[in-house]
A protein has these predicted regions:
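Glycine-rich phosphate-binding loop of ATP-dependent small-molecule kinases
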Residues: 1-167
Length: 167
């Protein structure tokens, strides 16, 4: 049971992907859960959308609710990697109160300049969620996902002005 901490764009998702393959445990990414809820038009998704589009943090009660639900699923019984939570002291306290435990914390530290470079080049597939970087990990064909052929887009929360606000 691990928690990955770091600013948006620090590489938590990338490292979580590697660790989950090696350890055979799921990665629980609050960002991915929220984006799926938005795509599916759930009440939680609609509530979160306005915050995310503005580059603001989604309220703690919403985050803790979705994380608690997800961690109750069978694939988390043997461990998990939390990516993006807790982000605040209040979230950490709420996780503890909910009986959610962890064994280790990994904090990823990089400069704001590097974060800006990474996020400005990040593209995500609208269909399958695969992630690319236009310089470091580009798709074979610009704007097209290698995995499913879907359209690659820049997330609204990766726009430079939004990234600055999130830092």
């Amino acid at each position: 049971k691990l928690i990955l901490l770091g600013a948006p764009g620090a590489g938590k998702g990338t490292q979580a992907e590697i660790l989950c393959r090696e350890l055979s445990i799921p990665t629980i990414s609050t960002g991915n859960i929220l984006r799926a809820a938005i795509k599916n038009g759930t009440p939680t998704g609609l509530k979160a959308k306005s915050y995310m589009d503005a580059g603001q943090l989604v309220p703690d009660d919403v985050i803790i609710g979705i994380v608690t639900e997800r961690l109750a699923e069978d694939d988390c019984k043997n461990g998990y990697i939390l990516d993006g939570v807790p982000r605040t002291i209040a979230q950490a306290a709420a996780l503890e109160k909910a009986g959610i435990t962890f064994d280790d914390v990994i904090s990823i530290e990089i400069s704001d300049e590097t974060i800006m470079e990474r996020m400005s080049g990040r593209r995500v597939c609208e269909s399958c969620g695969a992630s690319y970087h236009m310089v470091a990990v580009p798709p074979k064909q610009e704007g097209v996902c290698d995995k499913c052929g879907g359209k690659l887009v820049q997330r609204k929360d990766d726009a430079p002005e939004t990234v600055k606000a999130r830092l």
